[in-house]
A protein has these predicted regions:
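Sec-dependent signal peptide recognition
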Residues: 2-9
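C-terminal motif of bacterial Sec signal peptides marking the signal peptidase cleavage site
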Residues: 14-17
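Bacterial signal peptide processing site
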Residues: 19-21
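Pocket-lining segment of extracytoplasmic ligand-binding domains
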Residues: 93-94, 173-177, 181-266
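Secondary-structure end/capping motifs
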Residues: 232-312
Length: 331
């Protein structure tokens, strides 16, 4: 009987302790605010910092549950401009016609410090600079700004833009089209397509747009947000960007671990691990030369690109000076 009373006493103590612990846990739990965030494309190394921030709990620390999504049929910019999503990833060059028409959207951070896009070509054509592109086949999306970019870098080197043959590029994978001879050169991003070409042992030449026209060192990709969202949720936007910044800073210091985190959230990349790691090693050096200033957009560079668009009448409407970007939400 005495043993039974002792056992009963300890059972009661255990139940009281468990109940107390449960109450404490519920009290300490912070209700997270769910916020949608749209990618521009399939998950890739441009996005690594987002997934690192999610994995490391940086969003949770800010009271945010960031729901990272791929856009379905409508473009990321369209969804954000029309207030169907608050934030997402886009590009300064593609944003130009939207801003010219007065779209209510603002770039709030640059994911990569400098423009890493450029021209890749089959090595057999010995393309060493833009002039060498004469008489070759160009895989194009036939976008006025895109074509003007190629034109200026060719003319800056004494080349004749009219001597290229334009071939419609209907595939996201320009590398395969070059390998198959559909066209001879195309505009790509080094951190994905050039690394992919190297992984496939393709012999190619590459140069950056920015090396042949300083106007073309625009920001790509960028994080954009709906203006009404920013006006009504300024502090929330700062929290999100604070967490994202920490994610990219971690990826800068830990590229291989960051690549593995990306693969965890995008398992379709698992069979391309070596490629993803090499892509990440390249981009981790490109996100920011000073990681404390990750995301910062320089007004001079932003305006220089849009002034070039205005001066060459590439759009019907002009883009106002200093429009479409803000560093106010970065801390």
């Amino acid at each position: 009987m005495k043993k039974f009373k002792v056992l009963l006493f300890f059972m009661i103590l255990f139940l009281v302790a468990c109940n107390s612990k449960e109450k404490t846990t519920k009290t300490n739990q912070v209700e997270l605010k769910k916020v949608d965030f749209l990618l521009d494309w399939v998950p890739n190394t441009n996005h690594t910092g987002l997934f690192v921030a999610k994995e490391k709990g940086y969003f949770s620390e800010e009271g945010i549950d960031l729901d990272i999504k791929q856009p379905a049929n409508e473009s990321t910019s369209g969804l954000i401009i029309n207030n169907k999503a608050p934030m997402g990833i886009y590009f300064q060059d593609y944003l130009a016609p939207k801003l010219a028409k007065g779209a209510e959207v603002t770039a709030v951070a640059a994911i990569i410090e400098n423009n890493t896009s450029g021209i890749i070509s089959n090595k057999k054509f010995n393309v060493e600079n833009p002039k060498d592109l004469e008489n070759l086949k160009y895989g194009t999306w036939d976008i006025p700004i895109e074509l003007a970019m190629l034109k200026i870098i060719m003319e800056n080197q004494g080349g004749d833009f009219s001597k290229i043959q334009k071939i419609p590029n209907t595939d996201d994978n320009s590398i395969t089209n070059i390998a198959n001879g559909l066209f001879d050169f195309a505009g790509i991003y080094y951190g994905w397509d050039k690394i992919m070409a190297d992984e496939l042992k393709m012999e190619t030449n590459f140069f950056y747009y920015k090396d042949y026209a300083e106007e073309l060192n625009f920001y790509s990709p960028i994080i954009i947000a709906n203006n009404n969202y920013l006006k009504e949720n300024a502090e929330e936007a700062k929290k999100i960007l604070r967490a994202i910044k920490k994610g990219y800073q971690y990826a800068i210091d830990n590229p291989e671990e960051a690549a593995n985190i990306l693969i965890k959230y995008a398992p379709e990349l698992k069979n391309k691990k070596d490629f993803v790691v090499n892509s990440q090693k390249y981009l981790s050096k490109e996100y920011a030369s000073n990681k404390e200033k990750w995301g910062y957009i320089e007004a001079e560079r932003w305006n220089k690109f849009y002034n070039w668009i205005n001066d060459n009448d590439l759009l019907k409407e002009k883009i106002p000076e200093n429009s479409g970007f803000s560093n106010d939400y970065l801390e």
